[in-house]
Amino acid sequence: MLGLAAEENVLRIHIDELVFGLIAFAVIFALVYRYAVPRVTKMLDERADAIEGGIERAKKAEAEAEELRQQFQEKLEEAHRSYAAELQKASEQSAAIIAEAREEAQAEARRIIEAAHAQIEADRQQAMAQLRAEIGALSADLAARIVGETLSDPAAQSRVIDRFLAELESGANQQAEVR
């Protein structure tokens, strides 16, 4: 019987222990609820705020980065446009300089050619004058030898020389026409 009585005690619930256990549980629950829960809640709220703040800061940083990227892209495009404009301007200036240099070279070439023609004409006139003088002297000597008298009158010498040269030129022109 002892064994049976002992088994009954094990299954039997003692009210005083149950009440004491419930009171102890309620006190511990109240203390945890009063002191620990607010601290944990506060810590969780702070952590949530920190996470939300981090997310907001990340979004802000991302927005700022995007804005900076767009500004950089705009400046880069502006630099490309400016470069293209400067390149076009330099190309136009070089074309203008080349055209101006070409015109100056052509003008200089025309001036040199005209000066050469003028010099050739002056040399020809000078040679003709010298030739006339020499031919005149030679023809006067020749006429004096043939006729036997000298042409001392300069006007007469000039007429003889002019007539002789005219005959030479007409003979040269006739030969040129025959060819």
Curated annotation (Swiss-Prot):
Organism: Thermobifida fusca (strain YX)
Family as reported in the entry's similarity comment: Belongs to the ATPase B chain family.
Single Gene Ontology MF annotation: proton-transporting ATP synthase activity, rotational mechanism
InterPro entries for this protein: ATP_synth_B-like_membr_sf, ATP_synth_b/b'su_bac/chlpt, ATP_synth_F0_bsu_bac, ATP_synthase_B_chain
Gene symbol of the encoding locus: atpF
Topology class, membrane: Single-pass membrane protein
Location of this chain's protein in the cell: Cell membrane
Gene3D superfamilies per record: F1F0 ATP synthase subunit B, membrane domain
Pfam families: ATP-synt_B (PF00430)
Function: F(1)F(0) ATP synthase produces ATP from ADP in the presence of a proton or sodium gradient. F-type ATPases consist of two structural domains, F(1) containing the extramembraneous catalytic core and F(0) containing the membrane proton channel, linked together by a central stalk and a peripheral stalk. During catalysis, ATP synthesis in the catalytic domain of F(1) is coupled via a rotary mechanism of the central stalk subunits to proton translocation.
Main location: membrane
Keywords, alphabetical: ATP synthesis, Cell membrane, CF(0), Hydrogen ion transport, Ion transport, Membrane, Transmembrane, Transmembrane helix, Transport
Species lineage: Bacteria, Bacillati, Actinomycetota, Actinomycetes, Streptosporangiales
UniProt feature coiled coil, ranges: none
Top-rank taxon, per record: Bacteria
Cross-referenced HAMAP family: ATP_synth_b_bprime (MF_01398)
Protein name: ATP synthase subunit b
Residues that span the membrane, as ranges: 13-33
Quaternary state and interactors: F-type ATPases have 2 components, F(1) - the catalytic core - and F(0) - the membrane proton channel. F(1) has five subunits: alpha(3), beta(3), gamma(1), delta(1), epsilon(1). F(0) has three main subunits: a(1), b(2) and c(10-14). The alpha and beta chains form an alternating ring which encloses part of the gamma chain. F(1) is attached to F(0) by a central stalk formed by the gamma and epsilon chains, while a peripheral stalk is formed by the delta and b chains.
GO cellular component, one term: proton-transporting ATP synthase complex
